Design a protein with these regions (language model features):
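An N-terminal assembly and electron-transfer interface module characteristic of large anaerobic redox
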Residues: 1-195
Length: 195
């Protein structure tokens, strides 16, 4: 998670916050590279702790959600309390297919759709704090659809077009994909094997 960020002067598009939660643990290397190349300074919420959990409790609508999902509320609140005005937390049904022999690469329904829960449960909080909460449905497992959807999503940013998004994705795949994602996955696998 310790990745170099653009300085405030270098960040031509400003700051974007990413919560350190659920599937963002695995996907963060990609999103950090993606937003950095677009010119955003990326701010990541800190590691989970009791204070973060308790700070978000007032917006948890269901006691039946799993503990990791409940943590999301506190991470979002931390970003808002640290004056982050744009937060990105996408809904992702399918992850990148890492193992061709696996029967699927589908996220559990809570992981896939929890950004929608956050949007509904924290809408007033976002409004009161003038925060833009970005939670698009992203086809993370299909490069061409990903490029199309992310370009549509960012159509409010003047010069983020299809080619820009495609080039960032291509650059990430070549430069960082094997290094960041592969090494990160290996670290996880190594920990699982040794523990």
């Amino acid at each position: 998670f310790d990745r170099p960020c653009l300085s405030e002067e270098e960040a031509s598009r400003g700051v974007i916050g990413i919560p350190r939660v659920l599937n963002m643990y695995e996907d963060y290397p990609f999103w950090h590279a993606f937003f950095t190349k677009l010119g955003f300074r990326v701010v990541l919420s800190p590691a989970s702790n009791k204070e973060i959990y308790e700070s978000g409790m007032d917006s948890i609508s269901s006691d039946t959600a799993c503990y990791p999902a409940k943590l999301v509320h506190g991470h979002i609140k931390w970003l808002v309390e640290n004056d982050i005005k744009r937060i990105f937390y996408p809904s992702i049904n399918y992850e990148v297919e890492e193992d061709k022999t696996a029967p699927n690469h589908y996220n559990c329904p809570i992981v896939a759709t929890y950004p929608e829960v956050i949007d509904k449960n924290m809408a007033d909080y976002f409004y009161d704090n003038m925060v833009e909460f970005y939670h698009p449905f992203v086809p993370y497992d299909d490069d061409s659809r990903f490029v199309r959807e992310m370009t549509k999503f960012f159509n409010h940013e003047r010069d983020i077009d299809l080619d820009s998004t495609r080039n960032i994705l291509k650059t990430y795949d070549l430069e960082a994909g094997a290094r960041d994602y592969g090494l990160f996955s290996m670290e996880i696998s190594d920990k699982e094997i040794t523990e």
